Amino acid sequence: MERRRIIETKHEYFSPYNRFETVAIDLKWLPLSKDEKLEHEVFIVQFDPESSSSLHKHKGYEEFYVIDGELIDDDGKVFRKGDYVKFEKGTKHSSYSKTGCTLLVILYAGTNELNG
């Protein structure tokens, strides 16, 4: 019995980022894995140049690896290709990419979009 799943991401369609009420057309994503019971999900997200994520709060941890490009967090911290970042439970933030970037994201317990 096969107990693995292989996703050849270069052949997959990245759809507009629709995890929140508002669809972010300048962010694209490819869901890779999700466990509803454990509230755990893994996905790849691509930021177009000059795009940003909405302000959101993490109900659990968020971890991501910068595959390519640069991401700037709302406090000015720059994350570059090869960086691995972990946000603690309860973190509120938004991010921006001037040049575009690709991230491998791991979420625990999801996020809530915040207004302003």
Task: Describe the predicted segments one by one.
Residues H58-D74:
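Glycine- and acidic-residue-biased ligand/ion/polar-headgroup-sensing regions
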Residues K89-E113:
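Ligand-binding loop in jelly-roll beta-barrel domains
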Residues H40-V42, F64, C101-T102:
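Structural motif
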Residues M1-E39:
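A short, N-terminal "cap"/entry segment at the start of jelly-roll beta-barrel domains
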Residues K28-H58, I72, E88-K92:
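Conserved short histidine dyad/triad with adjacent acidic residue
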Residues K57-K59, K77-V78, S97-T99:
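Short glycine/proline-enriched turns and hinge-like loops at secondary-structure junctions
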